Amino acid sequence: MGERYNIHSQLEHLQSKYIGTGHADTTKFEWLTNQHRDSLASYMGHYDILNYFAIAENESKARVRFNLMERMLQPCGPPPEKLED
């Protein structure tokens, strides 16, 4: 019983510490946005992948990095409208 409580408290701690881990009220849009932003940040952080994208798009590395940062603003498009209850 004590171990179960410990696991839940660890999960709650991770969810409060890191944005992308989600929580019980995370919507599908928020989850996908976090996944896309995490992927884009990984692409920017790995030098070889950034070089590959630059060669494939025939752009400079700085331009590719700028485009990736621009895509991080709204990676899945505008958020869906909230339904009012």
From Swiss-Prot:
A single GO BP: mRNA splicing, via spliceosome
Q: What happens when the gene is disrupted?
A: Lethal at the first instar larval stage. RNAi-mediated knockdown in germ cells results in male sterility.
> Which residue spans adopt a coiled-coil conformation according to this UniProt entry?
none
Task: Note the Pfam families from the entry.
Answer: SF3b10
Entries under InterPro entries matching the protein: SF3b5/RDS3-10, Splicing_factor_3B_subunit_5
- UniProt record similarity statement: Belongs to the SF3B5 family.
| Gene Ontology CC terms, in alphabetical order | precatalytic spliceosome; SAGA complex; U2 snRNP
Query: Where found, per UniProt?
Result: Nucleus
Q: Which keywords describe this protein according to UniProt?
A: mRNA processing, mRNA splicing, Nucleus, Spliceosome
UniProt subunit comment: Component of the SF3B complex. SF3B complex associates with the splicing factor SF3A complex and a 12S RNA unit to form the U2 small nuclear ribonucleoproteins complex (U2 snRNP). Identified in the SAGA transcription regulatory histone acetylation (HAT) complex; the interaction is RNA-independent.
Q: Which PANTHER family match?
A: SPLICING FACTOR 3B SUBUNIT 5
The domain of life is Eukaryota
Asked whether the keyword Nucleus is assigned, the reply is yes
**Which gene is transcribed and translated to give this protein?**
Sf3b5
Summarizing the function annotation, the protein's role is: Involved in pre-mRNA splicing as component of spliceosome. As part of the spliceosome complex, plays a role in the regulation of spermatogonial differentiation. When associated with the SAGA transcription regulatory histone acetylation (HAT) complex, might be involved in the transcriptional activation of a subset of SAGA-regulated genes.
Q: What is this protein called?
A: Splicing factor 3B subunit 5
